[in-house]
Amino acid sequence: MDLSRIPAQPKPGVINILIEIAGGSQNKYEFDKDLEAFALDRVLYSSVKYPYDYGFVPNTLADDGDPLDGMVIIDEPTFPGCVIAARPIGFLEMIDGGDRDEKILAVPDKDPRYAHVKSLNDVAPHRLDEIAEFFRSYKNLEKKVTQILGWQDVDQVKALVDQSIKAYK
């Protein structure tokens, strides 16, 4: 899979998220650049499952040295390798293993059920709490420490995406 052909931002206000892990999975897949394929990194040590599809924004570089992470609120899980054109609505700031690690939260741009969702204010607070709790707890049994710093709304996303695209280039 040639990731260079997948633009980070196909149009203003929309990003591409390459799915690595389908919602509901305990398997943690990662895209292996050398193999150009998805490989099983590990099975989560705890009983938690990814609440929604999870992946990364191609052709970006975040502060942790990896592409910018993203989670897509979607009703039907997709599959590893699926590219979702998504509208970012905010991001979760956290520290993972001592490094800053932002997780963009987005909705599918082509799903009419989410046409009204423009910011974190359009998502039930309990849903945001569940997502934050997933990231807080899923590494506990691996003895890895994460710290949740909080949610940033949609007005902060553009700067994060632009910075990550610039860092990649």
Curated annotation (Swiss-Prot):
InterPro entries: Pyrophosphatase, Pyrophosphatase_sf. GO terms for cellular component: cytoplasm. GO terms for biological process: phosphate-containing compound metabolic process. It comes from Nostoc sp. (strain PCC 7120 / SAG 25.82 / UTEX 2576). GO terms for molecular function: inorganic diphosphate phosphatase activity; magnesium ion binding. It holds the Pfam family Pyrophosphatase. Disulfide bonds: none annotated. This is Inorganic pyrophosphatase. The gene is ppa. Keywords: Cytoplasm, Formylation, Hydrolase, Magnesium, Metal-binding. Belongs to the PPase family. PROSITE patterns: PPASE (PS00387). Its cofactor is Mg(2+). Catalyzes the hydrolysis of inorganic pyrophosphate (PPi) forming two phosphate ions. It catalyses: diphosphate + H2O = 2 phosphate + H(+). The lineage of its organism: Bacteria, Bacillati, Cyanobacteriota, Cyanophyceae, Nostocales. Substrate binds at residues 28, 42, 54, 138. Mg(2+) 1 binds at residues 64, 69, 101. The modification N-formylmethionine is found at residue 1. Homohexamer.
